[in-house]
């Protein structure tokens, strides 16, 4: 600012020896504030304005820039601290963290539903349980055994995801009616994404099986691949799920035969390098899971009867009705539990006898009690009971290693 121009009367008031300032009249002019020379040009000055006598507070606001019209809001740039002295996360940081984790969480949730976790858990438990049948003493539980078991479980889970993913790819329209929350049916995954996922998991399964070098393991993966593909893919002479009998046979072959025999032989012959033998517990596991696999094959279509009827899938539930198929499934399972109790009672091992008899009796009682209270007109109740059947499936694989 080059100059500050004041009125002569004010300059006189500032002179030494000046007596006193005359009182300001209400119609007095405010002095021009300033004039600024910029680059040698004409000075720019604020013009004087007429006022009706500003008050002291108004002058203070004017000269001190305290007017609310000129106040610049202050926003803290650093994060504050709470009473304990710990820094609090700013809202911007919280928003950034949320924006990062939300898509990751959504992707994981979609893949979780795509993988059909109840089948993944069943596959893992069955392989671990059957592999333990090859263990003869505690020294067999070695790093070699654990490595062979892990290789088998991972390869089988990859193949499991391929099979359930392929089924969803060819059932998109049906699942929009029966299972609208699945990612392909809901539109979260595009068909191209589904193709990429099932192709990747099939390749990883075969790649791991080939790298391990176990003939029983690779054979189990290959047969599961063939049956799973034929079950779902919509090509001439395939899509075996359209036939209730053939669909049940596919599930029975994988769940009851391949899982029990192939993975037992993988541990017995490839890991332990022992001759192939079919023990009493292995025969029991195969026979019991034959019943259980038939039940799963029949029961899984009960909640899906609406979509199956629309798209021409001739399941037993469509042909016979939900109620009749439901009680057939319950009867088959109760029969299997009775056989298991009788077999446990004939065991020469005392602890095995008690464990198998009491365990299967408890499961049979729970099944009967639950089946009597179900509302067969409610799809939600039927779906919940189907998941209960899978829990019984898991429990059986906890009992199988105790059979001796």
Swiss-Prot record:
Catalytic activity: phytyl diphosphate + homogentisate + H(+) = 2-methyl-6-phytyl-1,4-benzene-1,4-diol + CO2 + diphosphate
Superkingdom classification of source: Eukaryota
Biological processes per GO annotation: vitamin E biosynthetic process
Disulfide links within the chain: none
GO cellular component: chloroplast thylakoid membrane
Residue ranges crossing the lipid bilayer per the database entry: 119-139, 144-164, 184-204, 216-238, 245-265, 282-302, 325-345, 348-368, 382-402
Listed pathway(s): Cofactor biosynthesis; tocopherol biosynthesis
EC number, UniProt record: 2.5.1.115
Polar residues compositional bias, start-end: 76-92
Its membrane topology: Multi-pass membrane protein
Keywords linked to the UniProt accession: Chloroplast, Membrane, Plastid, Thylakoid, Transferase, Transit peptide, Transmembrane, Transmembrane helix
GO terms of molecular function: homogentisate phytyltransferase activity
Pfam families: UbiA
InterPro entries hit by this protein: AtHST-like, UbiA_prenyltransferase, UbiA_sf
Intracellular or extracellular location(s): Plastid, Chloroplast thylakoid membrane
Region listing for Disordered, in residue ranges: 68-96
Transit peptide limits: 1-77
Family note: Belongs to the UbiA prenyltransferase family.
Functional note: Involved in the synthesis of tocopherol (vitamin E). Catalyzes the condensation of homogentisate and phytyl diphosphate to form dimethylphytylhydroquinone.
Protein name: Probable homogentisate phytyltransferase 1, chloroplastic
């Amino acid at each position: 600012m080059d100059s500050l121009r004041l009125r002569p009367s004010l300059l006189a008031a500032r002179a030494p020896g000046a007596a006193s300032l005359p009182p300001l009249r209400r119609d007095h002019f405010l002095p021009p504030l300033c004039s600024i020379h910029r680059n040698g040009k004409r000075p720019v000055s604020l013009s004087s304005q007429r006022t009706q006598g500003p008050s002291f507070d108004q002058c203070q606001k004017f000269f001190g820039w305290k007017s609310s019209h000129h106040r610049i809001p202050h926003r803290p740039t650093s994060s504050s601290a709470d009473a304990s002295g710990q820094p609090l996360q700013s809202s911007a940081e919280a928003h950034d963290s949320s924006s990062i984790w939300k898509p990751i969480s959504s992707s994981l949730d979609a893949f979780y539903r795509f993988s059909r976790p109840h089948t993944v858990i069943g596959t893992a438990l069955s392989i671990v349980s059957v592999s333990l049948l090859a263990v003869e003493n505690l020294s067999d539980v070695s790093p070699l055994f654990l490595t062979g078991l892990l290789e088998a479980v991972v390869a089988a889970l990859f193949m499991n995801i391929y099979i359930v993913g392929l089924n969803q790819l060819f059932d998109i329209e049906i699942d929009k009616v029966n299972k609208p929350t699945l990612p392909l049916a809901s539109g979260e995954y595009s068909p191209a994404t589904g193709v990429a996922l099932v192709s990747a998991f099939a390749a990883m399964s075969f790649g791991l099986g080939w790298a391990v070098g176990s003939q029983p393991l690779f054979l189990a993966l290959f047969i599961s691949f063939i049956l799973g593909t034929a079950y779902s893919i919509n090509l001439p002479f395939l899509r075996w799920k359209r036939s209730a009998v053939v669909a049940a046979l596919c599930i029975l072959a994988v769940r009851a035969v391949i899982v029990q025999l192939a993975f037992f032989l993988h541990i017995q012959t490839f890991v332990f390098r022992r001759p192939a033998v079919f023990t009493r517990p292995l025969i029991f596991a195969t026979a019991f899971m034959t019943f259980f696999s038939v039940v799963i094959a029949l029961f899984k279509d009960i909640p899906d009867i609406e979509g199956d009827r629309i798209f021409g899938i001739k399941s037993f539930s469509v042909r016979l009705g939900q109620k009749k198929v439901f009680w057939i499934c319950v009867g088959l399972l109760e029969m299997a539990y009775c056989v298991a109790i009788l077999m446990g009672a004939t065991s020469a091992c005392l602890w095995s006898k008690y464990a198998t008899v009491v365990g299967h009796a408890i499961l049979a009682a729970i099944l009967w009690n639950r089946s009597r209270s179900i509302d067969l007109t409610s799809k939600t109740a039927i779906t919940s009971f189907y998941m209960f059947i899978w829990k019984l499936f898991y429990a059986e694989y906890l009992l199988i290693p105790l059979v001796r």
